Amino acid sequence: MDDLESTCASLRAQISATETQLAGLKRALHEAEQAAAHAKAQSAAATTAGDNHDKPRRWPLLDEEYRRYGRQMIVPQLGLPGQLKLRSARVLIVGAGGLGCPAALYLAGAGVGTLGLIDGDMVDVSNLHRQVLHRSANVGKLKVDSAIEYLRELNPHPTYIPHRAHLTPQEAPEIFQNYDVILDCTDNPATRYLISDTAVLLGKPLVSASALRTEGQLMVLNNPPRPAGDKTGGPCYRCVFPKPPPANSILSCADGGILGPVVGTMGVLQALEAIKVITSTEDEVRPPSLHIFSAYSSPPFRSIKLRSRRANCAVCSAERQVTLDTLRSGLTDYVFFCGSVSPEAVLTAEERIAPREYRAMYPAPTEGAPEKTPTLIDVREKVQYDICNLAESINIPISTIQASAAGSGDETGSSLPAWLPPEIASTDSTDPIYVVCRMGNDSQLAVRRLKELGLDRGGARVVADIQGGFRAWREQVDPEWPEY
């Protein structure tokens, strides 16, 4: 027994040492790739200069640059000084998706000198309706490489630096320190807090935006950048949102949906704000505001004035708890701070059924009638239910189910909510109840809620979810089921 324990301890130590070595190799590779990208860009710039290298330049820009940028240079707010500032600016875009694509497109077109892009995802066909730098031919390609390929065709003058991985607290400081302005084009709270914290700690202005369905928000944060405790500095993301939203309230574009022109509008506005930050003087910095865009409202734009830095902010106050050391060491846990959004542990294996097993037990109505007919509840929102649905299902949206508090009844005094159909609410029925959703997440929450209402009759009635939702249904039962 002692020998086995010693062997296990030795293996753990070897694994730990190997993981440490691997992390070091990854950092070394990242640094080497950055150095190679810079060297390649400098070589290209030297080649472009060509014959002009040995003779004094009469004008500060190349002749081709005057022709390319002339229409924006004659705008009074920009002019030649602004164009020169753009050419020397280094901008980092975190996220090459719906926000990052239009932002990168317009910054590259405007002549920003160095443009870095961070993203570890690959292009999916579902991205193409809104992520305008990616083409159908690039499905399956890294988003960063796909985006830079397009940008180089648009404007070969800027230096494009790819960061082919998701942002981590350990690597963020080393990446951010090489840039002047940061754009947050991500879609999850944990990364937003990480980006803001790193930008504040390194003194970088941050342009942050978000978009979902038909609405978007935009803020310029940490502008002007000031040391911790300096109240004249711009607020950070933590100053505006000291506490993250509840984990179960967060919707991604995949879950909530997104209209392409909406996220495109916000990305273009990010590019505009970045240009203003780069070309403006400190005297021209405006008070911080939250800009809200609602595509179906009139007027569609409104702004809310933001407060200055919070006196007790965890990152930009004099008594900050977040530092570069806590980032690099992993002591600042962003996933823990924001909470987990995964409902994987909500139900046990006995409370779930695979799509193929469900269809084997209960054939479609046209194929035969089972002895015990189950109730199949589809908890997708009505707009999704109307896209495609199973004929034998009924639609009770998850928002309706979650809106009623446990144990609350309707106005008649019933112990069950009014949204339950009579055949489900009947105290005599033991017919099974199955719940299905799009991905297999909301259905678990719905099953738990139905059991809280006592619909499982103390275990005498099956109340279960179809594991993996309609995504798994397409894989296991019906390959023609629409995937959206």
Curated annotation (Swiss-Prot):
Domain Rhodanese: 370-482
Binding of ATP, residues: G98, D119, S126, N127, L128, H129, R130, K143, D187, N188
Required cofactor names: Zn(2+)
InterPro entries per UniProt: MOCS3/Uba4, Rhodanese-like_dom, Rhodanese-like_dom_sf, ThiF/MoeB/HesA, ThiF_NAD_FAD-bd, Ubiquitin-activating_enz
Cleaved signal peptide residues: none
GO-annotated molecular function: AMPylase activity; ATP binding; identical protein binding; metal ion binding; molybdopterin-synthase adenylyltransferase activity; molybdopterin-synthase sulfurtransferase activity; thiosulfate-cyanide sulfurtransferase activity; URM1 activating enzyme activity
Official protein name in the record: Adenylyltransferase and sulfurtransferase uba4
Source organism (scientific name): Aspergillus terreus (strain NIH 2624 / FGSC A1156)
Gene name tied to this protein: uba4
